Amino acid sequence: MKKYQNKNPIITPAVQIWLAEQTAAGFTRARLFESLCASGWQASEAAQIMALTADEREAFGIQIRPLQTDQTSHVPQPKLIFHDVQVDGGDKWVRVLQQRSAPDLIEFEGLLSDAECDALMQSAQPRLSRSLTVDVQTGGHEIHPDRSSQGMFFERAESPLIATIETRIAKLLKWPATHGENLQILRYPPGAQYLPHYDYFDPAQAGTVELLKRGGQRVATLIMYLREPDSGGATIFPDIDLAVTPKRGNAVFFSYAAPEASTLTLHGGEPVITGEKWIATKWLRQSVFE
């Protein structure tokens, strides 16, 4: 495979390949620029990737604003000890399977017990409905074809089980339990998937102002696997060519200090082929989520 050399961390090999393929297919530079922005890149990042000229920027009719470095946030950061093998979760020690710095990502083993996984699924089952995504225009929620799972949210500390898990997560990630959205349970039957996306709220979208009123920007995501499918359903990170295989009780955590595609946190859920995949997701916010 050809090795790509570049000194710009936001221009990943995947982006370079995509840009070359789309150019060869005959798409205009204006269309490519719009596609990058629609995929989560800030306009200034997209302009940098494409090396837009001043004339092109003016012709596209889009004002290129500087990168929002003032939006960089403090993020959850687990404290690793024992040579990066285990993390203190308060009521249990949790083993680290892998750790990466670009993006900031950790895969945990045994964050949840089998009994906890079963109890979460049993409690969630009667409350499942078609999963919603954030409506970026209004700040509300909508059904989106990119997400074909079923889901529900628990209230914060609504039961001893939920309170225990939330407390463990807070200890593990060094982040207050109040600074996170309610725990979400998702069920993916055969064929269900979630196409690659970013979890942060795009500052360029109209609905973001409303979304930020309830706790500020999202700064990290924790995905916990409650049931592993027989095949398929991996959590993928296309920008870093990583696929995390679901395993019951395990979890993958990743943070993003700014709402920018350069955080390399583009991720998705591959289609489940056989069996079912169940996950619990916790999104962490800058401040108290109400």
Question: Which stretches of residues belong to each language-model region?
Answer:
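Fe(II)/2-oxoglutarate oxygenase catalytic core
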Residues: 1-28, 33-253, 257-290
